[in-house]
């Protein structure tokens, strides 16, 4: 691949041509791999690991993370696209195919001896015009918490990752989960939506739990497995004897001294446990009230036995991330000490129960009032399907979050690309000189999205583009109906793209494409490139 680097005495123009050819072929190659995934009619890819592990996905981020990419230019494009997903949660595939198409459209001008700098300048002008047009084209929503609008956004995102029937099933749960944790004038924290997986049943199923699901159960056979009307104590207190943080030795002379030392340790832990039992007896003054302890640290067998005899359900070693979720879902305060226990520090839930599935235990905390945390429970027959649903669910949550924060939407189905192409054609007429060739290349590259949507749906790309452009010329906002291949109104059909995703795609892709076009030589660097660029002894 890099054999050209080793050639000596080659002409500068020849080297530049080879470097450009290398970069363009890398962009087009990565584009050809991912373009078939785009849209609701996109195909799946099978990833096979070295150990024989198999993963089925059409998510661009998953593919680019898991694929082994040897080509340096392709790796650069992949890093750019995955950064897009880290920022906005979507648009990875669109970014890759846009960069690839920009390089592809530039190639024909380069073959006519147009300097790459001219094309790059055209890209810069077209990028600014495209982003300005996006500001005009977006549709500002007065109420971004409108449930119907958010359902349309979630459905558009999920249908590109999952079969339509499964995506429609998940849509309402994604929207309801976000609306549940939303606090006015505060940023949305998606970590407050726990995604829990359970492998069983014959088909994929997803449910929203307005509470919490913990992936462990009780550790004592006599503890209650189901409680109603529960007070919940969340704490981070060690209910077992712990070794000191500094090395310490305790010396004893005989067996009686050792027994007294062990008894002293047990009494110390048992005293903490009795404080919990006393609080339980204070608040549970009627038989219909119950008590649950969820501890981040350990609970030793003696304390578990004491709690079980008092009728308390005790869970130990809860995950750290679940402690904040518990307090947001159930109320109360997470306690780091048992010295100041009061009824005010307790949360409440109508139902707490344990469910066993094979060798796994799950604890459900349901029936909470005004929860600001929830759990989306995914059930599926295979690990592959569960992972596919989980990846799509994360993208759906990010899509709804982006819409709430953007306070606007963009008509989807390729509508923006068709409209932006027409606007750039008008803009090109106002520019003089060869820079307009870069604008033309950028405009042609925009059409790769509707073309790919049409091709993946089984329709002729050129015929489809002509139909869409003719309809747009009549003054209509028009997108592609992937079912029929005909133009449709994306607003009335409820098909929307995310403003922040499109803005990031058309801000970053021309920058990367321009940088790749301006590379005239590829040089193999030494091992010290990651370290200091200053030779030793010259600092």
From Swiss-Prot:
CDD domains recorded for this chain?
A: TCP1_zeta
Q: Which GO terms describe its biological process?
A: protein folding
Record flagged with keyword Cytoplasm: yes
User: Major location, coarse class?
Assistant: cytoplasm
Reading the lineage from the top rank, the first entry is Eukaryota
The UniProt GO MF terms for this protein read:
ATP binding; ATP hydrolysis activity; ATP-dependent protein folding chaperone; unfolded protein binding
Disulfide topology: none
Compartments where found = Cytoplasm
> Keyword set for this entry?
ATP-binding, Chaperone, Cytoplasm, Nucleotide-binding
Q: Pfam families attached here?
A: Cpn60_TCP1
Read off the PROSITE patterns from this record.
TCP1_1 (PS00750), TCP1_2 (PS00751), TCP1_3 (PS00995)
Return the GO cellular component terms, semicolon-separated.
chaperonin-containing T-complex; phagocytic vesicle
In UniProt terms, what function does this protein have? Molecular chaperone; assists the folding of proteins upon ATP hydrolysis. Known to play a role, in vitro, in the folding of actin and tubulin.
What protein family does this chain belong to? Belongs to the TCP-1 chaperonin family.
Q: How does it assemble?
A: Heterooligomeric complex of about 850 to 900 kDa that forms two stacked rings, 12 to 16 nm in diameter.
Q: Supply the name of the protein.
A: T-complex protein 1 subunit zeta
């Amino acid at each position: 691949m890099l054999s050209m680097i080793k050639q000596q005495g080659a002409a500068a123009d020849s080297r530049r041509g080879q470097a450009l050819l290398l970069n363009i072929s890398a962009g087009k190659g990565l584009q050809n791999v991912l373009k078939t995934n785009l849209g609701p009619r996109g195909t799946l890819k099978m990833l096979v690991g070295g150990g024989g592990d198999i993963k089925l996905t059409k998510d661009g981020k998953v593919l680019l993370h898991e694929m082994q990419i040897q080509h340096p230019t392709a790796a650069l494009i992949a890093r750019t696209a995955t950064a897009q997903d880290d920022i906005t949660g979507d648009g990875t595939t669109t970014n890759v195919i846009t960069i690839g198409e920009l390089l592809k459209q530039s190639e024909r001008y380069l073959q006519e001896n147009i300097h790459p700098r001219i094309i790059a300048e055209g890209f810069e002008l077209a990028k600014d015009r495209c982003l300005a047009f996006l500001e005009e084209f977006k549709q500002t929503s007065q109420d971004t918490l409108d449930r119907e609008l958010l359902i349309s956004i979630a459905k558009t995102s999920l249908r590109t990752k999952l079969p339509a029937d499964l995506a429609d099933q998940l849509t309402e749960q994604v929207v309801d989960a976000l609306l549940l944790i939303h606090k006015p004038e505060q940023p949305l924290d998606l970590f407050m939506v726990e995604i829990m997986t359970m492998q069983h049943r014959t088909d994929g199923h997803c449910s929203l739990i307005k509470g919490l699901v913990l992936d462990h159960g009780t550790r004592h056979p006599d503890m209650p497995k189901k409680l109603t009307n529960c007070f919940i104590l969340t704490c981070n207190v060690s209910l077992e004897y712990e070794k000191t943080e500094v090395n310490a030795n305790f010396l004893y002379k005989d067996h009686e001294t050792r027994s007294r030392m062990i008894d002293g340790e047990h009494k110390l832990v048992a005293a903490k446990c009795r404080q919990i039992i006393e609080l339980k007896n204070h608040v549970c003054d009627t038989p219909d009230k119950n008590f649950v302890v969820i501890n981040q640290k350990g609970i030793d067998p003696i304390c578990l036995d004491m709690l079980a005899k008092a009728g308390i359900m005790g869970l130990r070693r809860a995950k750290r991330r679940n402690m904040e979720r518990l307090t947001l879902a159930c109320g109360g305060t997470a306690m780091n000490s048992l010295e100041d226990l009061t009824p005010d520090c307790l949360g409440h839930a109508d139902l707490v129960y344990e469910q066993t599935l094979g060798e796994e235990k799950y604890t459900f905390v349901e029936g909470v009032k005004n929860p600001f945390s929830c759990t989306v429970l995914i059930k599926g027959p295979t690990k592959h399907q569960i992972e596919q649903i989980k990846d799509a669910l994360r993208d759906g949550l990010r899509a709804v979050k982006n819409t709430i924060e953007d306070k606007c939407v963009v008509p989807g189905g390729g509508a923006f690309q068709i409209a932006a192409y027409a606007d750039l054609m008008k803009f090109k007429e106002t520019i003089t000189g060869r820079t307009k060739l870069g604008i033309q290349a950028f405009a042609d590259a925009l059409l790769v999205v509707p073309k790919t949507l049409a091709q993946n749906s089984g329709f002729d790309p050129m015929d489809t583009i002509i139909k869409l452009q003719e309809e747009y010329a009549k003054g209509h906002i028009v997108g592609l109906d992937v079912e029929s291949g005909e133009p449709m109104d994306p607003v009335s059909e409820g098909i929307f793209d995310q403003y922040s995703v499109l803005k990031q795609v058309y801000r970053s892709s021309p920058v990367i494409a321009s940088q790749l076009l301006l590379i005239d030589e590829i040089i193999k660097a030494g091992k010290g490139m990651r370290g200091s660029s200053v030779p030793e002894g010259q600092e």
